[in-house]
């Protein structure tokens, strides 16, 4: 052993013990012939006292090994900020294991550094306690989840990383196959179809901490490769899966955040979430809610509202407490805020703090009757501001108000940052239009293997826009941290879904033939959930980005500053991999039987 003790483990009870420590020089202080060194390893920091002649060569981040006696610090010199603050090690021997060049990044929790430099020298960044503790927390989260699942007789099973591409879901990352030029593997977007095959195979309780890959456009706080806790169960109902999800999440929050989640976690239907919060992942830490005014404002002459109502659309409002105190510049700034989200603007009325009189551009266009009852209709008080959205499409207007609700909470300091608010969003739509046109076809909101609920299973073709699915998402503080569904296991129902989606038998066979073949042989009823592991760990760590809980994350643009990936390949590599090769006609003819399609992802 290079060392006998961890630096962070030393306590007053170790006084008089001779120890050997190994780690990095976090800090050195010279005191007239004596040098004090803060020695850091993975467990913490211990103070080491060395003679100047022994330690004059030491610099920050040198990797060293010391042997010495643990002694109590002189009275008054204790450091209550450190777990080891009552003791120090008087060194008898010092060995420099390796030297450190001048540092491009300060290894100091008190000094902020830019994201680019932190990612470029991530290995130095991880020596800081904040980033290191985030990864330790993630490791503990993995252990806790595994414990919960093993207590319930789940099997941890790995599924393929190299699979077959399919146009379903997001774009795939593709891998050329050297031994079969012109053919490609795809990296999985999730283990979705493989875990369903495991259910057919009798592996009734499956889980996996799964690596997933999606070639998406650049989006804030997304990574091209990510992790989900993937779960599938046979012979279960929606309630069974939700109960398991709650067991995992409540154990995680109790042990890692010290928070006891009240169970059962509240459930809200998808349509109620959109109507009340303008979002299918509502933040319930504050109580501001949307109000629909379509019926209240029916008959108005204000063209913006009247046009939406006549088109069978939606008019709604959200209240900003104390919003009337905003300056004209601040109120006008809301228009820029709305336009940045693709809207034409955000109409508003402010209520005078003294009289409650409605003022503002919209107030001039509403009748006296509508103005008189407006405050009561939306639950506003004198001094508040009321923001409106209207449109022929209800969802777009609701989502604009939902985004305004979040921004109102931020600007008005309504969010208790120490609070935790969870909910399940259930009864999601089964289908949505491919385009805004009424003639447009249908697509599955989740994926084409999601089961319609009992009310709709025999008649979803009658009104696809109103059909509901056995689908459920779990939300924490406005973040979707997991989602899943009960799957279709009946061949006749699956065929009807394919028919509605415009997937021909040939296309279904080409994309999912192996799954449909498996479903001929007695598939059990089954369902599952995928928990977004990066986001869950981010919340538990109190981090602002999922990058903080990933060992070697990429930038928003998918670039890795540490390795400079992605990089071009050489002409020789390109030739060897067969990147430019064309598949032989026989291979194209056999595409429908070439093997498993790339999985379609649970939303996370």
UniProtKB/Swiss-Prot annotation:
Positions of the site: Important for tRNA non-discrimination?
31, 76
Q: Where is this region: Aspartate?
A: 192-195
The answer to whether the entry has keyword ATP-binding is: yes
> Which UniProt key words apply to this protein?
Aminoacyl-tRNA synthetase, ATP-binding, Cytoplasm, Ligase, Nucleotide-binding, Protein biosynthesis
Which positions bind L-aspartate?
168, 214, 446, 487
* Residues bound to ATP: 214-216, 223, 480, 532-535
* CC per GO annotation: cytoplasm
Q: Which SUPFAM superfamilies match?
A: Class II aaRS and biotin synthetases, GAD domain-like, Nucleic acid-binding proteins
What pairs make up the disulfide bonds? none
Q: Tell me, in one coarse class, where this protein mainly resides.
A: cytoplasm
Q: An example of a Gene Ontology BP annotation on this entry?
A: aspartyl-tRNA aminoacylation
* Gene3D superfamilies noted in UniProt: Bira Bifunctional Protein, Domain 2 (3.30.930.10), GAD-like domain (3.30.1360.30), Nucleic acid-binding proteins (2.40.50.140)
Q: Which GO MF term does the entry hold, naming one? A: aspartate-tRNA(Asn) ligase activity
Biased segments, Low complexity type: 588-604
- The EC category is ligase
Disordered as annotated region, ranges: 575-604
User: Which EC number(s) does the record attach to this protein?
Assistant: 6.1.1.23
The annotated subunit structure for this chain is: Homodimer.
What name has this protein been given in UniProt? Aspartate--tRNA(Asp/Asn) ligase
Q: Which gene encodes it?
A: aspS
